[in-house]
């Protein structure tokens, strides 16, 4: 069954982008070898045969990462800024980089390894393409109704009240900047993942212990 509120494909983007068509199970162009949609919609997996040493991004990642082979939020911010993935948009804020790490921090180290970085990179590229598609005037911002459209294109089926609350949270004077848009995408994905892991019957209903709720939401 389709999961309530969530039906996105890889990278949380199910809308068609001009010149880019994806189906579940297909590798993402330019995202590295053996990279497929896996687990459930919105997440990417790596085959066991994938060797990071074969990827050109491995050298770049290790130049930024610490001796433990991982990056913290400040290192991730520097890495993404130097990579130019934001394009003409403002670089990602430190807070957005923190929640990016939290989204993929499955071992709760507060850091991001190379495979997690690659997964993030794929999601960011998809979200950026989505943003560029709806930012037709190339102003670097989208309007509130365009954010609602983007959320729907990602596969989320949300009530008008929920959409309005999200727009109020991430808009500034009725406009949503790229950094805030990505922060919104990250939180939607992370919180949906947190909820779905506990929704064993896939009915959109979960009972939380108080501390479990805090651990899942305060870290994002």
UniProtKB/Swiss-Prot annotation:
Gene3D superfamilies in UniProt: 6.10.140.900, EF-hand
Annotated Gene Ontology cellular component terms: cytosol; plasma membrane
Coarse class of the protein's main subcellular location: cytoplasm
Membrane-spanning residues: none
SUPFAM superfamilies xref list: EF-hand (SSF47473)
Subcellular locations according to the entry: Cytoplasm; Cytoplasmic granule membrane
Binding sites annotated in the UniProt record for Ca(2+) 1: 105, 107, 109, 111, 116
Record flagged with keyword Repressor: no
Record membrane topology: Peripheral membrane protein
GO MF terms held by the record: calcium ion binding; protein heterodimerization activity; protein homodimerization activity
Subunit: Homodimer. Interacts with SRI and LCP1.
Note, other: This protein has been shown to bind calcium with high affinity.
Chain's role: Calcium-binding protein that may play a role in the adhesion of neutrophils to fibronectin. May play a role in the formation of focal adhesions.
Protein name: Grancalcin
Protein species of origin: Mus musculus
């Amino acid at each position: 069954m389709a999961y309530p509120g969530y039906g996105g494909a890889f990278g949380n983007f199910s809308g068609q982008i001009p010149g880019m068509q994806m189906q579940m199970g297909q590798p993402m162009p330019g995202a590295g070898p053996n990279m497929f949609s896996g687990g459930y919609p919105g997440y990417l997996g790596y085959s066991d045969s994938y060797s990071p040493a074969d990827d050109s991004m491995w050298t770049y990642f290790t130049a930024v990462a610490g001796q433990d082979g991982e990056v913290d939020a400040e290192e991730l911010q520097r890495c993404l800024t130097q990579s130019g993935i934001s394009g003409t948009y403002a670089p990602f804020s430190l807070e957005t980089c923190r929640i990016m790490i939290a989204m993929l921090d499955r071992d709760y180290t507060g850091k991001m390894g190379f495979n997690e970085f690659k997964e993030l990179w794929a999601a960011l590229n998809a979200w950026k393409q989505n943003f560029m598609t709806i930012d037709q005037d190339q102003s670097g911002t989208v309007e509130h109704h365009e954010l609602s459209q983007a959320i729907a294109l990602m596969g989320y089926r949300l009530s008008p009240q929920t959409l309005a609350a999200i727009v109020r949270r991430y808009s500034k004077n009725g406009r949503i900047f790229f950094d805030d848009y990505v922060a919104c995408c990250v939180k939607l994905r992370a919180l949906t993942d947190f909820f779905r892991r506990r929704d064993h019957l896939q009915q959109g209903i979960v009972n939380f212990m108080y501390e479990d709720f805090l651990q899942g939401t305060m870290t994002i």
